[in-house]
Amino acid sequence: MSMNELAVNIPLEHMSNVFGQFDVYIRKIEKTLGVTVIVRDDQLKIIGNEANIKAASEVFTQLYELSRRGNVITEQNVNYALSLLAEKKETSLVEIDK
């Protein structure tokens, strides 16, 4: 199986909110989606198969958008974003927050 990489930018001021205390949300996303996430400065490098890195990128992008809007990210937000992906729902976490 071929491994791919995708870079996602998350501004430094949102990282602790998006990643959770001690990066707990990163670990949850890694475990659930079977990817590896490496953080360097304001960039995430997501490594895995193409479908999984795309899914992880979507989750991180949604969490960042919530953070940018001033929300405190919770484990429930992460779980919900992951469940929307699993159910292949067209609705995003960000749309629900409107």
Model-based region annotation:
Residues 1-17:
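Short glycine-/aliphatic-rich beta-strand segments at the starts of folded cytosolic domains
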Residues 3, 18-22, 39:
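A positional/architectural concept
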Residues 9, 20, 50:
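Conserved residues at beta->alpha junctions
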Residues 13-33:
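Short amphipathic alpha-helix segments
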Residues 38-97:
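Interdomain "pre-motor" coupling segment immediately N-terminal to P-loop NTPase/helicase cores
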